[in-house]
Amino acid sequence: MAATDVERVSNEEKRSLAMTGHVGFDSLPDQLVSKSVTQGFCFNILCVGETGIGKSTLMNTLFNTTFETEEASHYENGVRLRPRTYDLQESNVHLKLTIVDTVGFGDQINKDDSYRSVVDYIDTQFENYLQEELKIRRSLFNYHDSRIHVCLYFITPTGHSLKSLDLVTMKKLDSKVNIIPIIAKADTISKSELHKFKIKIMSELVSNGVQIYQFPTDDDAVAEINSVMNAHLPFAVVGSTEEVKVGNKLVRARQYPWGVVQVENESHCDFVKLREMLIRVNMEDLREQTHTRHYELYRRCKLEEMGFKDNDPDTQPFSLQETYEAKRKEFLGELQRKEEEMRQMFVNKVKETEAELKDKERELQEKFMQLKRVHQEESKKVEDKRRDLEEEMNSFNRRKAAMEALQSQSFQATSQQPLKKDKDRKN
């Protein structure tokens, strides 16, 4: 039977049956838990914020460890994404954690394209996963999923409003990743200023249409706490790995001349709230939202570009072969059209070149004729001057000959007079 002949079963036609004995599929949740624990989990965090705002310190504080970090310069030519992957274990749960730092973000004078490197990195991870899915022999079980599950956007504690760079970047990212805005180094402004700053940030995000991640409230188990925590966004956090003695206890805190800011004291900052929401309550939802919402949007757009599309229930579905043939015909038609355009462009170029050559030839011919006329005129002038010169030379030679003849006659006459005088004396 063909696939198109199979009748679709509606929900009304499904029946609920009672079993007369135990079957065993009630162990499916236990099987899933066992498989997940064996396979392990991955979680990828993107930290976006200016250099020196405390991204590395907060990550160390969140996971209660010290990650490898490199000192970042404020003189980067552009934004560079630097991923680091670590294997963590808590009890019998393995976590492959990837932290991606945005090196040089916001350090350039021209910040117009600062977000592009971040967007390109997220799209590249989506593309890598899509290419793995489209393989004939795919291995998603062993594939290291590098898609970004959450973006912690570090906001500079100015106490006034969001920077233009922050608004533009979050607007470009909100359809690609789950954004949780946090106010970094919240101990640098007063509580009253911090409260006003939070209200201002949320107001600007709403007015500019920036969609940040909202903790889910559809699950009764976490609906109440998530609903309360949504009202505390953005979280104002303080990070520190140093331990300070407060009373009889050592706590993680920042020591100042005027007092101590305790990291895990909820009256001092929202670090505990961030850790609860990010790790202990909503980590799996962040992973799920990345796959079912952001990646699916990217995947749908890419498949539509490739020619795939969903069909209405009443229309006959397209097979993969039909889609391939349709796309192939489209590409061949486009190729022929491009070839015809190139051929026509070549013909036009040849005609233009021929016309230019003819114009050049005509110009050269006219120039040649002009030079020929000038040459003839100059030759005639030279010939006339040559004739005049010959006539002058002939006239000169005639006068010279006559002069020489006269001189000869005069010499002979003067030489004969002394001879006559000598003869007369002898006589």
Swiss-Prot record:
Region described as G4 motif: 184-187
Location of this chain's protein in the cell: Cytoplasm; Cytoplasm, Cytoskeleton; Synapse; Cell projection, Axon
Sorted UniProt keywords: Cell projection, Coiled coil, Cytoplasm, Cytoplasmic vesicle, Cytoskeleton, GTP-binding, Membrane, Nucleotide-binding, Synapse
Region feature G3 motif, mapped onto this chain: 101-104
One biological process term in Gene Ontology: regulation of SNARE complex assembly
Sequence positions that bind GTP: 49-56, 104, 185-193, 239, 254
Listed GO CC annotations: axon; cytoskeleton; presynapse; synaptic vesicle membrane
UniProt feature, compositional bias: Basic and acidic residues: 374-389
Record's protein name: Septin-8
